Amino acid sequence: MNASVLGLCLSGPLVLLLAWLAPPVTSSWWYMRAAGSSRVMCDNVPGLVSRQRQLCHRHPEVMRSIGLGIAEWTAECQHQFRQHRWNCNTLDRDHSLFGRVLLRSSREAAFVYAISSAGVVFAITRACSQGELKSCSCDPKKKGSAKDSKGTFDWGGCSDNIDYGIKFARAFVDAKERKGKDARALMNLHNNRAGRKAVKRFLKQECKCHGVSGSCTLRTCWLAMADFRKTGDYLWRKYNGAIQVVMNQDGTGFTVANKRFKKPTKNDLVYFENSPDYCIKDRDAGSLGTAGRVCNLTSRGMDSCEVMCCGRGYDTARVTRMTKCECKFHWCCAVRCQDCLEALDVHTCKAPSSASEGAPT
């Protein structure tokens, strides 16, 4: 269907709805991972709004932490989606990092905004505790004595200053969304907040005992963030349970698209639009397709050849790899192995036929 015919088919209200939901192709602070020095980064990363540039110039060391943290949360995103058709692939030369795929207000967009916001909190908070930032240090509120279910303890060590991480992340990450008043901006703000809350959810108290023979007559405790994988796993569960919403009548909030489902909480991820199937390469949708992706012949999950390859079939190639074998334990403290060649079959998804290459997803 060409553009002129499509324009005739869309009614006025529907055109307005699509314009309301679809943001323009823009750059993002996510592109900061490719920047060099802080001054170059602040002045040349496309897409930063004025408030973000102000924070960038005032806190160059924080920006460095954010930039380094981008690799960590993108790797976590790729880990969580490793067995799915869309695998959170990034585009090094794209200013938006993920290309057009996140222009759709989908579950995937909800997850990426949440995990990126969480990643900023994690990176800044960790940098505070490691003494890398002038603007913060350990949590100043964790001093003196306190009580828990095990009795009295003294705050000591270095408690992670997660409140600072959350405050800075909110100011920096949310700045662009707060300039917009459309539905997508509200969706992004909601998912950004859910990501920040997820990091704090796994803040844990760690203690060290002092006393004769470890009797723990005196305890010193501090608060520490859990490994970022816990945040990733939690947000992955929220992705699978994400709630589809529509804007309320006054345009200030959400209501569930299906009245049978519960209203989303601040911890839930929300989205507006259904996802494409990601089966074929579609430049407009930002989908790279699954041609050439490795699939699991024995799996019944999303990584199975049947699901991953979208019914197109798969190719099988015999490959060899070096593995450790014939390992033996040597007294007292060593295990010695030989290097062996192992042959195995690798299955990869077939490309779509020329007839279906341009078919809509």
Swiss-Prot record:
It comes from Ornithorhynchus anatinus (Duckbill platypus). It is found in: Secreted, Extracellular space, Extracellular matrix. GO terms for cellular component: cytoplasm; extracellular space. InterPro entries: Wnt (IPR005817), Wnt2 (IPR009140), Wnt_C (IPR043158), Wnt_CS (IPR018161). Ligand for members of the frizzled family of seven transmembrane receptors. Probable developmental protein. May be a signaling molecule which affects the development of discrete regions of tissues. Is likely to signal over only few cell diameters. Belongs to the Wnt family. One of its GO terms (biological process) is cell-cell signaling. This is Protein Wnt-2. Disulfide bonds join 77-88, 128-136, 138-158, 207-221, 209-216, 279-310, 295-305, 309-349, 325-340, 327-337, 332-333.
